[in-house]
A protein has these predicted regions:
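N-terminal transmembrane-helix/juxtamembrane module of multi-pass inner/ER membrane proteins
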Residues: 1-46, 93-121
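Membrane-embedded catalytic cores of phosphoryl/pyrophosphoryl-handling enzymes
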Residues: 114-206
C-alpha cells in the first residue's frame, strides 16, 4: 500500500529531487519566507486580521436588513470554521505525525543527495503541517474571497507546499497529504456549522 499511495512507484522521490535540486539564493529566501508564513504559530495573527476584515465587511452599507443579516452570518461562519478547523487539524496532526512517524528526506535518502535549507528535521514527515495549515487558511476563507483572491490563495497554498520540498523538509506525498487532510477537515467543520446554524434558526422560528 505504501508503494502505491506514498512512494507512487518511485515518483515521490523523483519529484522531490526535481524540486529540491533547483537552487538559487533568491529562491531559497522566497521558500524560507513561504515556510515562515505557513507556520501554525501565525494562527493568532491571521485570526486577528480576519476578525478586523469581518468587522469592516459587515459594517458596509447594505441594501436591506436581510442582506446585512446574510453577510453577518457568512462572516461568522467563516471565522467559526477557521477557528474550529485549526483546532481539529492540530489534533489530527499531533496524532498522525508521531503515529505514522515517516522519515523526512534527510533520513530517508542519502544525506549528500538532499539540499537542506534551514533546520534539519528527520522524523514525523507525514503529513506536512505547514502545507496543512496553508490549505486550512485558504479553504476556510474561500466563501468570502473574490475570484482574484482565490487565485492568490491557491498560489499561497502551492508556495507553502513547494517550500517544504525545496527546503528539504518534506516529500511531495507529505505535502499532498497535508492538503487533503486540511481540506477534509474544513469541509467537515463547514458542514457541521451550517447544520448547527440551520438548527438554531429553526428553534428561533418556533
Amino acid at each position: 500500500m505504501k508503494e502505491i499511495f506514498y512512494d507512487w512507484g518511485g515518483a515521490n522521490v523523483w519529484l522531490f529531487h526535481a524540486i529540491n535540486n533547483i537552487r538559487f539564493e533568491w529562491l531559497d529566501n522566497v521558500m524560507l519566507f513561504g515556510t515562515y508564513l505557513g507556520g501554525h504559530t501565525f494562527f493568532p495573527f491571521y485570526l486577528v486580521i480576519l476578525t478586523l476584515i469581518a468587522l469592516f465587511a459587515v459594517n458596509r452599507p447594505a441594501q436591506d436588513f436581510s442582506s446585512y443579516e446574510t453577510r453577518v452570518k457568512r462572516w461568522m461562519a467563516v471565522i467559526a470554521v477557521f477557528s474550529f478547523a485549526y483546532w481539529l487539524d492540530g489534533i489530527l496532526l499531533g496524532t498522525l505525525k508521531p503515529l505514522l512517524d515517516f522519515p523526512r528526506p534527510p533520513l530517508a535518502l542519502p544525506l549528500e543527495t538532499v539540499n537542506i535549507i534551514g533546520a534539519t528535521e528527520l522524523h514525523h514527515s507525514l503529513p506536512s503541517g505547514h502545507s496543512s495549515f496553508a490549505m486550512m487558511v485558504v479553504a476556510s476563507l474561500w466563501p468570502v474571497l473574490t475570484r482574484w483572491l482565490r487565485v492568490a490563495g491557491v498560489c499561497f497554498v502551492l508556495w507553502v507546499g513547494l517550500s517544504r520540498i525545496s527546503l528539504g523538509a518534506h516529500f511531495p506525498a507529505d505535502v499532498l497529504a497535508g492538503f487533503i487532510l486540511s481540506l477534509a477537515v474544513v469541509l467537515l467543520v463547514y458542514v457541521a456549522i451550517q447544520q448547527l446554524m440551520q438548527l438554531m434558526r429553526k428553534e428561533h422560528a418556533t
